[in-house]
Amino acid sequence: MATAGALVVLPSYTAATPAPGSFDFVFFTDTHIQPELDAAYGCDLCFKKIAGLKPEFAMMGGDHVFDAFGVNNVRAGMVYDLYERTEQLLGMPLHHAIGNHDVFGVLAKSGVASTDPAYGKKMFQDRMGRTYYSFDYKSYHFVVLDSIQPTKDRLWEARVDEAQLRWLRDDLKALPHGMPVIAVVHCPLVTAFATYAYTQIVGADRKYNTMTVANAPDVLQIFENANVLAVLQGHTHVNEVVNYKNTQYITSGAVCGNWWRGPRMGTPEGFTVVSLRQGKISWRYETYGFHSVVPPERP
């Protein structure tokens, strides 16, 4: 099954800016790998299908594991090891974003001390690398953002912190005029999720904003000074696109669907294939044939 996205034409480029190339890459997110619920088998199926499509690289939108946030070192290390072994099936360059479930031991119920050397984002950094960064590929600029900020009371908020905002502003300012930008972030910057999942948002007892980036307007203001073609997002497990100010905010469905219990609000388990063709972007959502072995329990 594949669901196609809209085609957006980029503006013309100056002589000083190399023409953007043509290639495909895959964006997948929210694997939530675990030894339960056939999750490793599902990731195996998914990664083999991605590899068979032969994209030039893949980008992972966060929530690699289930879970590191509220568990001890043994469980967190085990699910990270499981993810890293399974990821080898991709056999291609891979760029990671951090998700809330990837942060280690922050919830008090984990029993992990804040002085633990792997506490917070350190476990992710040791295994996956930096939490925010950028790179160029065939005259496109890719930006990976960190939307997960643990709080002093051992909870978390979806936010892009001040140091990162300064970095992003400088990073985009240094680009050649007209160079197309594609951003990746775990928690959405722009989404319609609160409209069709209103009861889930309103009914949740949350001290902090954990569904969408709390200071998204600050990020969007920086984006206005660059040619941001698309933002690839995860976290909600629902496939959607919102077009805002000539940027596509594409939220991909999850590899795990409804946390390995079937489709999530109509979106089956899958990933997003992004096609870039000389400054034009299109995308489609692909499923990979996973069938849950348990009845759905989560909304």
Language-model region placement:
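N-terminal export leaders
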Residues: 1-8
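N-terminal active-site segment of His-dependent metallophosphoesterases
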Residues: 10-76
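Extended active-site neighborhood of metal-dependent phosphoesterases/phosphodiesterases
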Residues: 17, 70-180, 206-209, 214, ...
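Active-site glycine-centered loops adjacent to acidic/histidine catalytic or metal-binding residues
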Residues: 30, 62-63, 99-100, 186, ...
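Short acidic, glycine-rich surface-loop motifs adjacent to enzyme active sites
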Residues: 65, 175-194
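Active-site His/acidic residue clusters
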Residues: 151, 189-204
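Histidine-centered catalytic micro-motifs
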Residues: 183-189, 229-239
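Acidic, His/Gly-rich catalytic cores of divalent-metal-dependent hydrolytic chemistry
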Residues: 278-299
